[in-house]
Amino acid sequence: MERTFLAVKPDGVQRGLVGEIISRYEAKGFTLVGLKLMVVSRELAEQHYGEHKEKPFFSGLVDFITSGPVVAMVWEGKGVVAAARKIIGATNPLGSEPGTIRGDFGIDIGRNIIHGSDAVETAQREISLWFKSEELADWSPTLTSWIYE
């Protein structure tokens, strides 16, 4: 089954949106297999955003993600990477559709509430960066047979 990495950023945690965000993925039928509240180290932030290292906004990304607690999560399910991105909405909240997390709660691109892996390969890299294998639960909810054929 496919897995993706999501992180509720410091603005989402401070605004009390963690429960709302988790509820959206549970209601969709995805399975939460990893969850932790953490303060992100500068080293982890720089690794996570490594692809943007030469871009002018890199230091701002690192400063923001390390500015407060983050809720890191791993979700599992059929097509979860693409579906999670649809639930999140466009990077710029002002361009996000109503009904998406960013469309409903975001205003500014620099405070866009949540990160989600953009591809299966990215998800695998991000999951291994943020979680040890023993921190991920291998389980199936009883409702799985009601969601998948």
From Swiss-Prot:
<dbReference type="InterPro" id="IPR034907">
    <property type="entry name" value="NDK-like_dom"/>
</dbReference>
<dbReference type="Pfam" id="PF00334">
    <property type="entry name" value="NDK"/>
</dbReference>
<feature type="active site" description="Pros-phosphohistidine intermediate">
    <location>
        <position position="115"/>
    </location>
</feature>
<feature type="binding site">
    <location>
        <position position="85"/>
    </location>
    <ligand>
        <name>ATP</name>
    </ligand>
</feature>
<feature type="binding site">
    <location>
        <position position="91"/>
    </location>
    <ligand>
        <name>ATP</name>
    </ligand>
</feature>
<keyword id="KW-0067">ATP-binding</keyword>
<keyword id="KW-0479">Metal-binding</keyword>
<protein>
    <recommendedName>
        <fullName>Nucleoside diphosphate kinase</fullName>
        <ecNumber>2.7.4.6</ecNumber>
    </recommendedName>
</protein>
<feature type="binding site">
    <location>
        <position position="102"/>
    </location>
    <ligand>
        <name>ATP</name>
    </ligand>
</feature>
<feature type="binding site">
    <location>
        <position position="9"/>
    </location>
    <ligand>
        <name>ATP</name>
    </ligand>
</feature>
<dbReference type="GO" id="GO:0006228">
    <property type="term" value="P:UTP biosynthetic process"/>
</dbReference>
<dbReference type="GO" id="GO:0005737">
    <property type="term" value="C:cytoplasm"/>
</dbReference>
<dbReference type="InterPro" id="IPR001564">
    <property type="entry name" value="Nucleoside_diP_kinase"/>
</dbReference>
<keyword id="KW-0547">Nucleotide-binding</keyword>
<keyword id="KW-0418">Kinase</keyword>
<keyword id="KW-0460">Magnesium</keyword>
<dbReference type="GO" id="GO:0006183">
    <property type="term" value="P:GTP biosynthetic process"/>
</dbReference>
<keyword id="KW-0546">Nucleotide metabolism</keyword>
<feature type="binding site">
    <location>
        <position position="57"/>
    </location>
    <ligand>
        <name>ATP</name>
    </ligand>
</feature>
<dbReference type="InterPro" id="IPR036850">
    <property type="entry name" value="NDK-like_dom_sf"/>
</dbReference>
<keyword id="KW-0808">Transferase</keyword>
<dbReference type="GO" id="GO:0005524">
    <property type="term" value="F:ATP binding"/>
</dbReference>
<keyword id="KW-0963">Cytoplasm</keyword>
<dbReference type="InterPro" id="IPR023005">
    <property type="entry name" value="Nucleoside_diP_kinase_AS"/>
</dbReference>
<keyword id="KW-0597">Phosphoprotein</keyword>
<dbReference type="GO" id="GO:0046872">
    <property type="term" value="F:metal ion binding"/>
</dbReference>
<comment type="function">
    <text>Major role in the synthesis of nucleoside triphosphates other than ATP. The ATP gamma phosphate is transferred to the NDP beta phosphate via a ping-pong mechanism, using a phosphorylated active-site intermediate.</text>
</comment>
<comment type="subunit">
    <text>Homotetramer.</text>
</comment>
<dbReference type="GO" id="GO:0006241">
    <property type="term" value="P:CTP biosynthetic process"/>
</dbReference>
<dbReference type="GO" id="GO:0004550">
    <property type="term" value="F:nucleoside diphosphate kinase activity"/>
</dbReference>
<comment type="similarity">
    <text>Belongs to the NDK family.</text>
</comment>
<feature type="binding site">
    <location>
        <position position="112"/>
    </location>
    <ligand>
        <name>ATP</name>
    </ligand>
</feature>
